[in-house]
């Protein structure tokens, strides 16, 4: 990375200056950032401002000394200019040849170009999807899945040791409701008339599960008490639904390294051990929740049970989360002594933290209020809040021709992820889910996703990759060999559009690293769209001006082909990070072969 070269030169210069006694030894705390205005150079370095107090010198005076040391360290001539600005920033301009050599690096590293070691092998567990095993995945789950997979992919490219994890909520009330729904359908299959309660699961898959149980057990559980069949029906139903979920995930090419079970946390004694740990650390006590707040001028409302049946009137075992920044202390055991869902959840995070250096949770935006209590739990358990990062996923609105689509015609329920993938394809599904920040609502237009037109974002990027492949096909037909890097030839890449593409290619590794550290895979989608737009513009202008990629000048042709080679590699790598294919052949928007368009 060109930025790495700047860092290397400044570190070398600062170390040499410290050895010579010109200033104290510097840490690695200075920053190297691209300025917002390109007129200020390629990078701005704040080393003098960081070191000034320790050195006892004015920042601008120290900056001048550092500039002289950096110039002495730059024996290869990689820097074209150094100037002092503002309170002591050092603006850096790189030599044109250093930029050009990034093209050679992109081609040499091939499918690994963009990988960095910023993660230094740090172990990270990324937990995502974790949809309840009570039905097929809907499009909201799909966005969580794709964003989570994008996050883990970015972290791998940045040198982290990543475990992809799915937490299966197979213990609580919802899976019991599923089991009871299946039992009602089981009775129905035996000829009985049943009425499905309002909170039961209505999907056709429930009938399929019931049919499987009928085939295996006949009428054995028809009149049996619930205690005899509930666990069996629950476990059978959960496994059936998990099979559906695995199939839905496979449709978007997502898999997991580990499936962690809530039920297993209880059966293995992890939850009990965790509760004992809390007691030993004096992190829990028996008390009552604060009473519900009353509206102005009205009497206080009566305490109402929450979804787990807990009320403020009961004596509960409370976790001292308010001591760690939460609003109130949270119950970890109900009045009857059974653990709460929150207890199992922080026990799970306790377990994860023992297996990794850092945790990433990808959660629906409706869990935003849950984040402070998780952060409080992490701190109470002796970890840092920084060891947990939560990515929130906003809602998806499915659109068709500008109209909102809420229900599936096939199932009468929320539109499933599989239905969308079957209609628009895996690549379009994955890419469009990443065309906005995850914490912003997303409109997913099914008709747009199917179009082979340049207003379809995934088609636009893939079409650019295919156009580059077609350029090489045409070059071979014209007798041009795929060129190796030639610095003299590369110096002919002097137009503003070519220089812009070179800088975009050079920025790719830094962009990936920054996106990984911010847990923001949409940055890659933005980069690809902006970069391919720059390519299409350059290519079109070249055709109009007579400066085509394949032209009469063999030196310029070789240079432009090498630029295209590096750009094609970057596009392929960027799409690979997002789990999207990079086709070499596509139909053009006008439905003719793309090779006719180069």
Curated annotation (Swiss-Prot):
* Predominant location: cytoplasm
The region called Disordered is annotated at: 288-309
HAMAP family (UniProt xref):
Arg_tRNA_synth (MF_00123)
UniProt entry tagged with the keyword DNA damage:
no
EC code = 6.1.1.19
Entry-linked InterPro entries: aa-tRNA-synth_I_CS, Arg-tRNA-ligase, Arg-tRNA-synth_N, Arg-tRNA-synth_N_sf, ArgRS_core, DALR_anticod-bd, Rossmann-like_a/b/a_fold, tRNAsynth_Ia_anticodon-bd
Short name of one Pfam family: Arg_tRNA_synt_N
What is the annotated localization of this protein? Answer: Cytoplasm
Q: What are the protein's UniProt keywords?
A: Aminoacyl-tRNA synthetase, ATP-binding, Cytoplasm, Ligase, Nucleotide-binding, Protein biosynthesis
> Which CDD domains did the record assign?
ArgRS_core
| Stated family | Belongs to the class-I aminoacyl-tRNA synthetase family.
What is the main EC category here?
ligase
Task: Give the highest taxon in the source lineage.
Answer: Bacteria
Quaternary structure, from the entry: Monomer.
Q: Where is this motif: 'HIGH' region?
A: 131-141
Q: Which GO terms describe its cellular component?
A: cytoplasm
Catalysis: reaction(s):
tRNA(Arg) + L-arginine + ATP = L-arginyl-tRNA(Arg) + AMP + diphosphate
Single biological process term from Gene Ontology: arginyl-tRNA aminoacylation
State what protein this is by name: Arginine--tRNA ligase
Molecular function, one GO term: ATP binding
Q: Work out whether the entry's keyword set contains Oxidoreductase.
A: no
């Amino acid at each position: 990375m060109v930025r790495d070269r700047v860092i290397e030169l400044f570190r070398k210069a600062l170390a040499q200056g410290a050895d010579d006694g010109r200033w104290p030894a510097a840490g690695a705390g200075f920053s190297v950032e691209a300025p917002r205005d390109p007129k200020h150079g390629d990078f701005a370095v704040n080393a003098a401002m960081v070191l000034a107090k320790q050195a006892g010198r004015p920042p601008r005076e120290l900056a001048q000394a550092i500039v002289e040391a950096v110039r002495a360290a730059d024996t290869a001539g990689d820097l074209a200019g150094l100037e002092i600005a503002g309170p002591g920033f050092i603006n850096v301009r790189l030599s044109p040849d250093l930029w050009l050599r990034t093209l050679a690096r992109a081609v040499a590293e091939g499918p690994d170009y963009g990988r960095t070691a910023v993660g230094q092998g740090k172990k990270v567990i990324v937990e995502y999807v974790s949809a309840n095993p009570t039905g097929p995945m809907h499009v909201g789950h799909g966005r969580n899945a794709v964003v989570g997979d994008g996050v883990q992919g970015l972290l791998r490219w940045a040198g982290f040791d990543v475990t992809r994890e799915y937490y299966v909520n197979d213990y609580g009330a919802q899976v019991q409701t599923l089991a009871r729904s299946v039992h009602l359908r089981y009775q129905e299959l035996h000829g009985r008339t049943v009425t499905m309660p309002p909170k039961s699961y209505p999907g056709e898959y429930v009938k399929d599960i019931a049919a499987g149980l009928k085939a295996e057990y006949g009428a054995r559980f028809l009149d049996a008490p619930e205690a005899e069949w509930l666990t069996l029906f629950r476990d059978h139903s959960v496994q059936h639904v998990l099979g559906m979920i695995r199939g839905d995930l496979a449709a978007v090419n997502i898999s997991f390294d580990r499936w962690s079970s809530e039920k297993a946390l209880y059966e293995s004694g992890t939850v009990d051990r965790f509760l004992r740990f809390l007691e030993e650390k004096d992190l829990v006590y028996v008390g009552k929740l604060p009473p519900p707040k009353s509206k102005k001028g009205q009497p206080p409302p009566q305490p109402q049970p929450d979804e787990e049946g807990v009320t403020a009137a009961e004596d509960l075992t409370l976790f001292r989360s308010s001591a760690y920044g939460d609003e109130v202390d949270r119950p970890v055991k109900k009045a009857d002594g059974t653990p709460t869902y929150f207890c199992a959840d922080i026990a799970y995070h306790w377990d994860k933290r023992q297996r990794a250096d850092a945790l990433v949770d990808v959660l629906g935006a409706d869990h935003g209020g849950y984040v402070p209590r998780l952060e409080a739990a992490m701190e109470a358990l002796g970890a840092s809040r920084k060891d947990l990062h939560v990515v929130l996923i906003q809602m998806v609105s499915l659109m068709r021709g500008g109209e909102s689509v809420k229900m599936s015609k096939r199932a009468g329920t929320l539109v499933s992820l599989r239905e969308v993938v079957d209609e628009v394809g895996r690549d379009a599904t994955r890419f469009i889910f990443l065309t906005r920040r995850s914490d912003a609502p997303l409109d997913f237009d099914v008709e747009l996703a199917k179009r082979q037109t340049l207003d379809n974002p995934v088609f636009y990027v893939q079409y650019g990759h295919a156009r580059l492949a077609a350029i090489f096909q045409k070059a071979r037909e014209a007798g041009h060999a795929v060129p190796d890097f030639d610095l003299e030839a590369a110096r002919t890449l002097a137009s503003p559009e070519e220089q812009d593409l070179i800088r975009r290619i050079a920025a790719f590794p830094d962009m990936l690293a920054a996106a990984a550290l911010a847990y923001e895979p949409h940055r890659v989608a933005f980069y690809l769209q902006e970069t391919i737009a720059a390519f299409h513009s350059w290519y079109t202008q070249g055709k109009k001006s007579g400066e085509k990629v394949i032209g009469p000048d063999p030196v310029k042709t070789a240079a432009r082909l090498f630029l295209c080679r590096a750009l094609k590699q970057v596009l392929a790598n960027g799409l690979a990070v997002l789990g999207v294919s990079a086709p070499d052949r596509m139909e053009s928007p006008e439905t003719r072969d793309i090779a006719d368009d180069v």
